[in-house]
């Protein structure tokens, strides 16, 4: 479900929605708990499609195991791992919160955060200062940053999103403009920007396609090479978060993701390796 309304209104709905999602994951986890080979993941919607592919690959190679993946956002991934609703929480955060300190954090991939506009937009480069100005609401018209005159449609993620948390942390913490359109996944951000010539958004580098245009940030393109080199400024790790005690099936899946086949799959889909 896309949340097409300002941040203030979306914020009031976030907590109940997150509680519902945790309950759903808890039910799934309980249903699977009796199966020795069941592995449940929940959290980051940025990593969710990649995790689903990894799960499919692992399930095919290990029919005795059933790996299931749910989204919900990084905040939910942390809470699900803490309360046992999921064996593996997924989070894409530059900084893990204090409540995750009791969890084992394993980096399984790295990802750039691409800043994207509609392909017809003539703007192809922004500085970090300009980008923050747009998301704070100080810069409201494309003509002020080299584009054609017209209001900027600011597209952001919901408050529990790891992509949003990382984006705001790297730019320097700020209060998001209340005019922003809030979306609940990378995919809906992509579709919104693809369908609005005046929009700007941010999403996982691995999900950029021909429907949108990734722009340079501080003069650096968002490419695999420049992300790996450390020159591109908007980069975050992808974590698997677990309790100390893991089932053999969960440990086997994590080992697969960190191994040559899993890392090759991650890279083939546009993300960066863990190391």
Residue ranges of predicted features:
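Feature targets compositionally biased, intrinsically disordered low-complexity regions
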Residues: 7-10, 28, 33-36
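N-terminal secretory signal peptides that target proteins for export/translocation
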Residues: 1-14
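Exported/periplasmic ABC-transporter solute-binding proteins
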Residues: 32-275
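Hydrophobic alpha-helical context, especially transmembrane and signal-peptide helices
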Residues: 2, 17-20, 34, 68
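Bacterial N-terminal signal peptides
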Residues: 16-29
């Amino acid at each position: 479900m896309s949340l097409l309304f300002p941040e203030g209104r979306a914020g009031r709905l976030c907590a109940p929605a997150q509680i519902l999602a945790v309950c759903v994951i808890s039910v799934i986890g309980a249903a699977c708990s009796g199966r020795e080979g069941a592995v449940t993941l929940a959290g980051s919607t940025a990593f969710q499609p990649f995790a689903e592919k990894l799960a499919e690959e692992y399930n095919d190679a290990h029919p005795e195991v059933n790996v299931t993946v749910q989204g919900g956002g990084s905040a939910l991934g942390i809470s699900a791992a803490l309360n046992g609703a999921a064996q593996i929480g997924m989070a894409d955060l530059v900084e893990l919160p204090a409540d995750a300190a009791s969890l084992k954090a394993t980096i399984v991939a790295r990802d750039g955060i691409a800043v994207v506009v509609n392909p017809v937009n003539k703007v192809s480069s922004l500085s970090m200062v300009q980008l923050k100005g747009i998301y704070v609401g100080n810069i409201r018209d494309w003509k002020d940053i080299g584009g054609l005159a017209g209001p900027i449609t600011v597209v952001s993620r919901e408050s529990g999103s790891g992509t949003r948390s990382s984006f705001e942390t790297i730019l320097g913490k700020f209060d998001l403009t209340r005019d922003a359109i809030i979306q609940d996944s990378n995919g809906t951000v992509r579709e919104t920007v693809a369908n609005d010539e005046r929009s700007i958004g941010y999403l996982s580098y691995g999900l950029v396609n021909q429907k949108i245009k990734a722009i340079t940030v501080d003069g650096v393109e968002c490419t695999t090479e420049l992300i790996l080199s450390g020159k591109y400024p908007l980069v975050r790790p992808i974590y698997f978060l677990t309790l100390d005690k893991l089932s053999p099936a969960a440990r086997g899946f994590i080992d697969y993701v960190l191994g040559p086949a899993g890392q090759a799959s991650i890279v083939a889909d546009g993300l960066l390796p863990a190391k």
